[in-house]
A protein has these predicted regions:
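Hydrophobic alpha-helical segments, chiefly the membrane-spanning helices
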Residues: 195-196
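Phosphodiester-processing cores and adjacent nucleic acid-binding clamps
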Residues: 1-187, 191
Length: 196
């Protein structure tokens, strides 16, 4: 069982011609292997994210219910509406059970494998602009999630040329709350100026 390992680059059936696994099967397999989460990073899109988060929320409903009930019990003990012999011991036991339940939660990491234009996303002039490099972009918080949505949306609406593309200036503009990872064989070498 792999308890300390999390895949940060996973394609689902929403990565056409590359991924074939369903979201549910990926999550189930990761959980079966003892993983605490996975990052869904489909090529140039976030089409599977809603399905991913909904499925993980469904799988997490048991532990979340336990946590809610335990917190309610603690509040009742503190308010005096729940009877028990040793309040401090009971609260400590409830808090320990909360930690156990939290350790059962599966973490859905939202991301995208983005295509980055060699020059700018607005240039669409033949072969140099057809290719570029790839980056894995992960949201580490709500701000990052919103910035990732902006990057992917702009890649489709402004940068599309053979595929949805972003560029360095967009990454610099919307970097807050994001973690950016390079892919060895298809990435531009890491540069300090990529994201400040």
């Amino acid at each position: 069982i792999m308890q300390d390992f999390v895949h940060l680059h996973v394609h689902t059936q929403y990565s056409l011609l590359d991924g074939q696994a369903s979201v549910a099967r990926l999550v189930d397999k990761a959980m079966k292997n003892g993983m605490k989460g996975i990052a869904v990073t489909d090529h140039g899109n976030m089409f599977g994210i809603k399905e991913f988060t909904n499925y993980v929320n469904k799988k997490n409903s048991g532990p979340k219910g336990e946590i809610k009930d335990l917190k309610k019990r603690i509040a009742g003990i503190e308010a005096g509406t729940v009877e028990c012999e040793d309040k401090e011991a009971e609260i400590a036991a409830c808090k320990a059970k909360i930690v156990e339940a939290e350790n059962k939660l599966f973490k859905p990491i939202i991301g995208c494998e983005m295509y980055v234009a060699r020059r700018t996303m607005d240039l669409k002039e033949g072969k140099p602009d057809q290719s570029g490099y790839h980056l894995i972009v992960l949201a580490k918080n709500e701000k990052g999630y919103h910035n990732l949505i902006k990057l992917v949306s702009h890649a489709w609406t402004r940068g599309y040329y053979m595929r949805p593309r972003t560029d360095r200036s967009e990454l610099e503009r919307y970097h807050e709350g994001l973690i950016v990872l390079s892919l060895i064989h298809i990435s531009e070498p890491t540069r300090p100026r990529l994201i400040s």
